[in-house]
């Protein structure tokens, strides 16, 4: 079942938390609502599931207008970051709780509990209590419970935030597998761009209650529509430099960029850490720190009160405190308007 949001506005008193959000989520896809704290991603999710009520606009599931309905009227599955498992119940009872409320036949309920437990790979844990499970296993129980009643839509609010790094990676892979196997339409809320990039069919990047960009992870990384998107997507963050342009040319130290814009205007140059060459001349900087990341090293450079991040091969040797020249690779520079911060071109 697909989801449509049409000009959705959510207010808390005089504060507008969601401002004219329009979005279409295709049936059977997993999309991530991504953004910094306060961007409106969780508020959007809670409005879709009926916890918050919209000030205006519409929410449509399939061809059904569900605007303003209560959560229990929507037939959706919900997974929260705190798992919300009942500690006195077994895993079997936790998974079956929504089926009991829906008055499922006991035999059919037992069959469904085992079915979803196998789907999330916890069928050997059904007679344990939540306290006997790891964080990752508890999260799988929460997902199984959400899927038990066969929802067409699954909503997950920061479901991995309480897990350690290794478990986060494993569990997000499991969520993706489960979503593909079941074909459920899923919305995954996260502030972690790595999670969103790895799990999503599409990313919806939000800021200040509005959508900045909707696209596939690869397209958002390669083709950001503004400086905010470029800075939020990618690790480390994109490097930025303000440039004065004259006759289409911008200069930083001995590094010259041509054909920037025909207009006489100031722009912002952006380039990613992996798109930099070490050179004999170019942008001069001092090496502040060298971090070993395995196959690569991350250099933190200082240049005229600016900080640049540069990735180099592990075999490249340079000492902290030394000088270095760098050049952004041709065709890998992003030009943004200084005033609007909108994307202009690559060069």
Segments predicted by a language model, with ranges:
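Non-catalytic connector elements of ABC transporters
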Residues: 236, 249-347
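Helix-to-loop junction immediately C-terminal to a conserved catalytic motif
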Residues: 49
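Conserved ABC transporter NBD signature motif
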Residues: 57-65
């Amino acid at each position: 079942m697909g989801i449509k949001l049409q000009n959705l506005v959510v207010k808390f008193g005089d504060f507008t938390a969601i401002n004219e959000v329009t979005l279409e989520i295709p049936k059977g896809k997993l999309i991530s609502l991504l953004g910094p704290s306060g961007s409106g991603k969780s508020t959007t999710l809670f409005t879709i599931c009926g916890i918050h009520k919209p000030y205006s606009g519409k929410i449509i599931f399939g061809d059904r207008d569900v605007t303003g309905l209560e959560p229990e009227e929507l037939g959706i599955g919900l997974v929260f970051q705190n798992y919300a498992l009942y500690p006195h119940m077994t895993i079997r009872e936790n998974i079956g709780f929504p089926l009991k409320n829906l008055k499922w036949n006991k035999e059919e309920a037992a069959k469904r509990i085992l079915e979803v437990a196998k789907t999330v790979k916890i069928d050997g844990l059904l007679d344990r209590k939540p306290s006997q499970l790891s964080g990752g296993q508890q999260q799988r129980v929460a997902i199984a419970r959400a899927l038990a009643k066969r929802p067409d839509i699954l909503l997950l609010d920061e479901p991995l935030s309480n897990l350690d790094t290794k478990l986060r990676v494993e569990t997000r892979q499991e969520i993706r597998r489960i979503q593909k196997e079941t074909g459920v339409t899923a919305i995954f809320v996260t502030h972690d761009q790595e999670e969103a990039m790895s799990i999503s069919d599409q990313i919806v990047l939000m800021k200040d209650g509005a959508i900045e960009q909707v696209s596939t992870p690869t397209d958002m990384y390669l083709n950001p529509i503004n400086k905010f998107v470029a800075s939020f997507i990618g690790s480390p963050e994109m490097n930025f430099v303000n440039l004065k342009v004259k006759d289409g040319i911008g200069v930083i130290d001995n590094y010259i960029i041509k054909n920037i814009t025909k207009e006489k205007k100031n722009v912002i140059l952006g380039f990613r850490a992996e798109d930099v060459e070490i050179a004999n001349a170019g942008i001069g900087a001092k090496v502040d720190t060298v971090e070993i990341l395995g196959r690569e090293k991350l250099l933190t450079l200082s240049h005229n009160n600016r900080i640049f991040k540069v990735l180099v091969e592990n075999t490249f040797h340079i000492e902290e405190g030394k000088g270095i020249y760098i050049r952004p690779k041709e065709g890998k520079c992003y030009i943004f308007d200084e005033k609007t911060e909108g994307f202009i071109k690559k060069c």
